[in-house]
Each structure stands twice: as structure tokens, then as C-alpha cells.
């Protein structure tokens, strides 16, 4: 254990898709200071997204310096650094110089679609699902690594000679912060690469062979809570987790059946399944999260495509509201949605339907329907879609949902949170601390060095600000949900398939 007596702070580095952030926490897990810096998004072609890895490192370093200065702290007062990051985004750099050979290919980038189609044609879907827990998609790192090695001249040969290194953003930052001494990732980030066997907890040789990725470029994989190395100023780097898994830990969802939903543009749902890697029959991803001390625990992950974006649509395209915050007021003005259902399948439907041909629709319109009813139906759609995913997770895992922890921008909406509790028939718990992702990284780092000693101590820090209890009778709940399911069924398979046009 490191001596942490005179070091009363932990810094969490939250490296996101559009900005880098640094958040300093004290021993009571209060936020002492925050710094944020946006960076440039590069779109070289339609569907392609890149970041400059050097800019990511520069903004992350600047945020750390700024957060320390704002709190009037010196680096020798920091007990540890925890890192959480945008997942799947891929960097390859030179071992000797630390210079990237290409921009970082971002998780949203679709350039490796053809590589993924070939994997499907080669009949690898079942193998990849069984081994990595993932579906074949350009989202994950494996096909991005192959694309760089295929397209940067001489890079595969250099990789074989051990001259190049691959990493997700956590790995890249640690390499830079330790002055090129440490090449490491954690189990949560490794589980998002499509190259990692989540059962044996090792890089999968067959996937490396299929994608022609030399093993020499891969980082060592470690637990999410341990000392990996030290920054140039001597601070231990002691926690790593991908952003969604960090939020799951920050919410203290460390036991099987505990789940969290992050309400953003879309919604990210993760449910802890403990020591059991559950293979989903409903299109969920099987991924690695963190157990009580940051050790490997499995989780199911599902995404809702349109959450907050549905409210943005009401504001920007339909002009029904001026501000997203107004939705709570309008939705609460009416006693129900007057039979209206809005299915926001603007880009198809995600889990558990996986229907790219579905399109959005409003159902149940009569002359008595007012704007308030439509606004209410839009908010309700977020809660219904969340139930769709959680029902599928419970079916897959056999775990009963104990409660739902929530974070993200939309959790400030009391109407939405209450309706979520009503339609799930379970407690919805909103934390006092909204920085759950950064808090998860801080918790993992703090546990590793003895800054915090036990899970019970952490649970006391993860204070729940408000619990929303279901106030709706079961018969009414199921009637509302049956209406939603009927509406969803009508939106399915709306667009013609490519071969029908």
C-alpha cells in the first residue's frame, strides 16, 4: 500500500468523445474542482470520425494542470490517478518515438464496415459472440486495427518487429503519462476490442489470426483497480475502466441484478451479472464490468438509440418546446398521454428489436390530443424503451432487477424518473453525485492504494439524493406497456429492404 496519509485527493481523468475532463475528489468523494477542454472532431469522409491522439493527450494534461490550479493544490497532494475513457477508439503509435502512425479511429467511425461484412461472410458471428461477447460491428476496435495496418504502408511488418503499439485511449494516456514505461489496459476496455476472450481473460489468437493483427502490438491486460505505474511527477496511476463500466462502479452496482441507465442522446444500460457471463438471446452485449474490489465481474449491455435525441427533435424540428427542461412542466400538466404513443425509431430500433427498417411514428391521435400529450408521450417513450432492454436482460440472466440507478442529463426530469419507476415497477435511485463516471474511476484508484479501505466505505460515499417509488398499480402498468408494444409492432419493417427497392 502507498502511504496516503498526507495525500487527501484523487484525480479522475474522464477522456470523452468530444472533450477531456479532470475532476478532483476529496476523501468524502466531494468534487473539489473540475476542468474541461474540447478538442477537434475530424470527418475526412462521410461516416468516418477521427481524433488527433496528441491533441487528446495535450487537452487531458492541460485539464489536469488547470484542475489542480483551481483547487490550489500541488501534485504531491494527489494520492492517485484514475482513468476512464471513451471505449473502442483505436490508436497505433511508434514504440520509440511515441508518435501515432495515424489519427485515432473513433468508436462512431464506420470505415471498417467491409471488414466486418467479410467476417460475417466467413461465418464468424457465432464464434465472436461466444468468445468476445460482442456482435460483429465496426463499433469495436478489432476491425479498426486491421484497417490501419491494411492502409498505412509498412505498418504490419513494423508491428511484427515490435516497433508499433496498439491501445484504446486508456492505454495511450498511460503510455504518455508514464513516459513510455507502461503498456497496459484493463479488462473492461479489452472486452470492447473484439480481440479478447472474456472467459479465459486472454487475447484470442484465432481473432488475431483472422484479422492479421500481430500479437506484439497488444498491451498487457490487468484488473481495473491496481497500480499500473507512476506519472512523471510520481503519482500512482491506479484505476482504469471504460466510461460505461466506470459509471456502473461509480453507482455501486457491484452485485448481480444491480443495473444503471445513463440517459444521454441515447441510453446506455448495464446490468451486473456477477461471475456469470450471460450469453444473450436478445441481442445484448456480454461485457466485463467490475466486482466489489474492481475485479472482473460480467455485465449485460444494451443501448437505446433515441433517448434525449427525441426531446431534441421536439425542440429543434417540431418547435413544440423552447428548452428540453420545459418537458417536465408540459408533461405534468396532463394526467396521462391521452392514449398517444410516440415510437422514436428515427434510425431504426436498437435492443432488443434490432430492426434497422423500423421508422418513427405517433399513434392514438384524436381531436382531443394536445401538444402536452405529445410531449408527455415523448418522455414516456424513453422509459418504455428502457423497460424493453431491462426486461430482455432479466430474461437473459435470470436475475431479478433489484433497483435501477440512473445518471446522465435527463435524470433531472422528475416526471421522467417517476414514470420510469411506474413502468418498471421498481425503485429508481438518483444519486446526489452526477459525476458517476469520474467517481467510478476515482473509486477504483482509491481502493487500489488504500485511500478508501472497503466497499462499505464507498457505498456511504455514493449517496442517493432521491428514490422514486412505483405509484402505479400492476394492471394499469401492464396495460400501458401493452399499448407501447402494440405501437412498436406497427413501426417494424417499415422501410423497404435494399433488395426490394
From Swiss-Prot:
InterPro entries: ATPase_NBD (IPR043129), Carb_kinase_FGGY (IPR000577), Carb_kinase_FGGY_CS (IPR018483), FGGY_C (IPR018485), FGGY_N (IPR018484), Glycerol_kin (IPR005999). Its EC number is 2.7.1.30. GO terms for molecular function: ATP binding; glycerol kinase activity. The keyword Membrane does not apply. Glycerol binds at residues 87-88, 139, 243-244. ATP binds at residues 17-19, 265, 308, 312, 409. Signal peptide: none annotated. Inhibited by fructose 1,6-bisphosphate (FBP). Key enzyme in the regulation of glycerol uptake and metabolism. Catalyzes the phosphorylation of glycerol to yield sn-glycerol 3-phosphate. HAMAP family: Glycerol_kin. This is Glycerol kinase. It comes from Pseudomonas savastanoi pv. phaseolicola (strain 1448A / Race 6) (Pseudomonas syringae pv. phaseolicola (strain 1448A / Race 6)).
Amino acid at each position: 500500500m502507498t502511504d496516503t496519509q498526507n495525500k487527501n485527493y484523487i484525480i479522475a481523468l474522464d477522456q470523452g468523445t468530444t472533450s477531456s475532463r479532470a475532476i478532483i475528489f476529496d476523501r468524502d468523494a466531494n468534487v473539489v474542482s473540475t476542468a474541461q477542454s474540447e478538442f477537434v472532431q475530424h470527418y475526412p469522409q462521410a461516416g468516418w470520425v477521427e481524433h488527433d491522439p496528441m491533441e487528446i493527450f495535450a487537452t487531458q494534461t492541460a485539464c489536469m494542470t488547470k484542475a489542480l490550479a483551481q483547487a490550489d493544490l500541488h501534485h504531491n497532494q494527489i494520492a492517485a490517478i484514475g482513468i476512464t475513457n471513451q471505449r473502442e477508439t483505436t490508436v497505433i503509435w511508434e514504440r520509440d518515438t511515441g508518435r501515432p502512425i495515424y489519427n485515432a479511429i473513433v468508436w462512431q467511425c464506420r470505415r471498417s464496415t467491409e471488414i466486418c461484412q467479410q467476417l460475417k461472410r466467413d461465418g464468424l458471428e457465432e464464434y465472436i459472440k461466444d468468445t468476445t461477447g460482442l456482435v460483429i460491428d465496426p463499433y469495436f476496435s478489432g476491425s479498426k486495427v486491421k484497417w490501419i495496418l491494411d492502409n498505412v504502408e509498412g505498418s504490419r511488418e513494423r508491428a511484427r518487429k515490435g516497433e508499433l503499439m496498439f491501445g484504446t485511449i486508456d492505454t495511450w494516456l498511460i503510455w504518455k503519462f508514464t513516459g513510455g514505461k507502461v503498456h497496459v489496459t484493463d479488462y473492461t476496455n479489452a472486452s470492447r476490442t473484439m480481440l479478447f476472450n472474456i472467459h479465459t481473460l486472454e487475447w484470442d489468437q484465432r481473432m488475431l489470426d483472422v484479422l492479421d493483427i500481430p500479437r506484439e502490438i497488444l498491451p498487457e491486460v490487468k484488473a481495473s483497480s491496481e497500480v499500473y505505474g507512476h506519472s512523471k511527477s510520481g503519482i500512482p496511476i491506479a484505476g482504469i475502466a471504460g466510461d460505461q463500466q466506470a459509471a456502473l462502479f461509480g453507482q455501486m452496482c457491484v452485485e448481480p441484478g444491480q443495473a444503471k441507465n445513463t440517459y444521454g442522446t441515447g441510453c446506455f444500460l448495464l446490468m451486473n451479472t456477477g461471475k456469470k457471463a450471460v450469453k444473450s438471446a436478445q441481442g445484448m452485449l456480454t461485457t466485463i464490468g467490475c466486482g466489489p474490489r474492481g475485479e472482473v465481474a460480467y455485465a449485460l449491455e444494451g443501448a437505446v438509440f433515441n433517448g434525449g435525441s427525441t426531446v431534441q427533435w421536439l425542440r429543434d424540428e417540431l418547435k413544440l418546446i423552447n428548452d428540453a427542461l420545459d418537458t417536465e412542466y408540459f408533461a405534468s400538466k396532463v394526467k396521462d398521454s391521452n392514449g398517444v404513443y410516440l415510437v422514436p425509431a428515427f434510425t431504426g430500433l436498437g435492443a432488443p428489436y434490432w430492426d434497422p427498417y423500423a421508422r418513427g411514428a405517433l399513434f392514438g391521435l384524436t381531436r382531443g390530443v394536445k401538444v402536452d400529450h405529445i410531449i408527455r408521450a415523448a418522455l414516456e417513450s424513453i422509459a418504455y424503451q428502457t423497460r424493453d432492454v431491462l426486461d430482455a436482460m432479466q430474461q437473459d440472466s435470470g436475475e431479478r432487477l433489484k433497483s435501477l440507478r440512473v445518471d446522465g442529463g435527463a435524470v433531472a426530469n422528475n416526471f421522467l424518473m417517476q414514470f420510469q419507476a411506474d413502468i418498471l415497477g421498481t425503485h429508481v435511485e438518483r444519486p446526489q453525485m452526477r459525476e458517476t463516471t469520474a467517481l467510478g474511476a476515482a473509486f477504483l484508484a482509491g481502493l487500489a492504494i488504500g485511500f478508501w479501505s472497503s466497499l462499505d466505505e464507498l457505498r456511504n460515499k455514493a449517496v442517493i439524493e432521491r428514490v422514486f417509488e412505483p405509484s402505479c398499480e400492476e394492471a394499469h402498468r401492464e396495460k400501458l406497456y401493452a399499448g407501447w408494444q402494440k405501437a412498436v409492432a406497427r413501426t417494424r419493417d417499415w422501410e423497404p429492404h435494399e433488395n426490394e427497392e
